């Protein structure tokens, strides 16, 4: 018989479960503000703003210093290492600002992808070295949850069984290390939207990936009540000629989750995967309106799909701060409604909200 050493104490389990429940409390989701320096540079480049530490800090200050009502829509904020140690213009650390609003601070923990030998261009994730020490330090510095993103792609030869197993195992090792150090692990196995595959192919692959992930989490004695899942929605490939409705996406996604994700998991926080802001909200809303059983909270962990309108309103100008904050708050409120299946689209959305945010082979 297998045994878990060291086992989590009842107190550790309760602390992890409480954090996870706070993040996905009713109508709340996650703001993913953990873009790396390079990825943030690409975002700033689109609005002709230079990628400096100050500009990155200034934009994130806009998001974090938004009206206190934002905490009704956002339960947690994922930060990049740089951002965890930055301050607002008055000298207050960002984690303190986030916590004062009643939101939970998270930290990106993976160190990006590395080629996986023996596969056709597939990858595994780096960052397990010294992860326990990093988790302990981040916990001291104010973080209460972590995030680790694994990436799988769909093609005629991928994902391979090797890539699925390797990434599932790495996610499980990360999750176990997080929990030993008091951090709730967000488990993110992303099946990329690149390609021309249809909805059914994405569903088949996502089911295989999630089944492998939960087998690995069980093998590694991960306490599921103290975790969150951040999966892709089940959508057709970006180049698929056939278009599907939000209802199609909802049925395929919820069916996939029912087949693979234990009811013990408190919340499923979808990534937006390059969908437009509006598309991501409509798909989430359709899932929460679905008559299928949903034993977990279905919510969001959006980066691009929460920030695009705010970036477009800001344009790097301090005088646009209020407009950018209003755009961000509006999008957060829409997604909060979508978490409850209560979003009714007016049909009038601005260009930034309907623009595709897809980037091929997207890296964070």
Curated annotation (Swiss-Prot):
Its EC number is 4.1.2.13. Substrate binds at residues 56, 147. The keyword Phosphoprotein does not apply. It catalyses: beta-D-fructose 1,6-bisphosphate = D-glyceraldehyde 3-phosphate + dihydroxyacetone phosphate. CDD domains: FBP_aldolase_I_a (cd00948). Pathway: Carbohydrate degradation; glycolysis; D-glyceraldehyde 3-phosphate and glycerone phosphate from D-glucose: step 4/4. It is an enzyme of class 4 (lyase). Disulfide bonds: none annotated. The record marks 364 as: Necessary for preference for fructose 1,6-bisphosphate over fructose 1-phosphate. It holds the Pfam family Glycolytic. InterPro entries: Aldolase_I_AS, Aldolase_TIM, FBA_I. GO terms for cellular component: centriolar satellite; cytosol; extracellular exosome; microtubule organizing center. Keywords: Cytoplasm, Cytoskeleton, Glycolysis, Lyase, Schiff base. The active site is at residues 188, 230. GO terms for molecular function: ATPase binding; cytoskeletal protein binding; fructose binding; fructose-1-phosphate aldolase activity; fructose-bisphosphate aldolase activity; identical protein binding; molecular adaptor activity. The keyword Cytoplasm applies. It is found in: Cytoplasm, Cytoskeleton, Microtubule organizing center, Centrosome, Centriolar satellite. One of its GO terms (biological process) is positive regulation of ATP-dependent activity. Homotetramer. Belongs to the class I fructose-bisphosphate aldolase family. In vertebrates, 3 forms of this ubiquitous glycolytic enzyme are found, aldolase A in muscle, aldolase B in liver and aldolase C in brain. This is Fructose-bisphosphate aldolase B. It comes from Gallus gallus.
